[in-house]
From Swiss-Prot:
Renumbered residue ranges of the record's region N-terminal SAM-like domain: 1-151
Chain intervals with Polar residues compositional bias: 105-114, 167-186
Official protein name in the record: Fe-S cluster assembly protein DRE2
Organism encoding this protein: Ajellomyces capsulatus (strain NAm1 / WU24) (Darling's disease fungus)
Location of the region described as Linker in the Swiss-Prot/TrEMBL record: 152-243
Gene: DRE2
Residue window of motif Cx2C motif 2: 325-328
Role according to the record: Component of the cytosolic iron-sulfur (Fe-S) protein assembly (CIA) machinery required for the maturation of extramitochondrial Fe-S proteins. Part of an electron transfer chain functioning in an early step of cytosolic Fe-S biogenesis, facilitating the de novo assembly of a [4Fe-4S] cluster on the scaffold complex CFD1-NBP35. Electrons are transferred to DRE2 from NADPH via the FAD- and FMN-containing protein TAH18.
Residues binding [4Fe-4S] cluster: 314, 317, 325, 328
Region feature (Fe-S binding site B): 314-328
Amino acid sequence: MATTGRVLLLSPPSLSSHPEKLNAILKSHTRDKTDLQMLDRLAHGLVSLPESTYDIVLLLTGADNTLAETHSLLNRELIQRVVHSLRPAGKLRNRENKPWGLSDGNGSNANSSRRYNDDEQRFRNEVILAGLVFDDKGELLKPDIGAQQAIPLKLSRRRKEKEKTDTLASSANYSTNGTVGAPSSNGISAPIPAAKTTENNPVPPGVGFIDFSDDFGVPAEDDPQDSDEELIDEDELLDEDDMGRQIVQPPECRPKPGKRRRACKDCSCGLSQKLEAKDKAKRATADKALETMKLGSSELAEVDFTVQGKVGSCGNCSLGDAFRCDGCPYIGLPAFKPGEEVRLLNNDVQL
């Protein structure tokens, strides 16, 4: 089967054990324009296909001369890669070059009435989802989207000028006394009484006005059309029983075990306000506890160790805090020998 353009042969792995069949297939194609790839290597990602390269992709049959093995290996990702390797207007064919018989199922093809297995049905759905379509011959074709061009529609200049002239003439022929001038055969304009205009439509022909009565800027009391409508008070829609009814918390707002309850961003069940009030109460309690721990200037006792001759009354100042009295000036200092000089360096006691 001689073909023009670049051809990609997709072979199932079972065909590799029959080199005589594979060589016979390769002899029917031009070798410099034909590429051969194994479906199992493509499925495992060991090789890749170039995009928009091949005019025809040919699915080869397996060792049993059926496409069952080929269909089982063609998954969704692999089919999309095969479709991307096709050029626009490229075709996906089988080895026998027979119509797929899956285009419409109306009996036009010989194979359209048979029952397909799961792999064939899945293959049909996947190739359609990948972007292939059936042509008139029942072959799978990649549509050429670039060939479709949008043609802008433009009104002719003469038509625009004619419409403008007709509008101006209609406005000019309308007179103030309610008559319309109609040209006669002798060129003299004869007055023709115009149709009586009603109060609902006092608009001359060919002239349009915009009705702003439906705008939101018109107050309700000034709009005669909406004056009879009854206004509903939102507060009357809920009674006391509805206001006192317990709020049902949605499942998504319920906290999971071991986690703190959190409100949604657009919370409408009251959880956000409840958590905010609880946080404020905790913060106020903590601030109040801190205030009780603060000492005033009159409550602070300053111990001056530089004053000479200042000794404790118990005589146990050098033994440590365990032996010192409550008013001992050496509280907080380590034990020392009587008469030893005590120095402070960087707020640390140096004995």
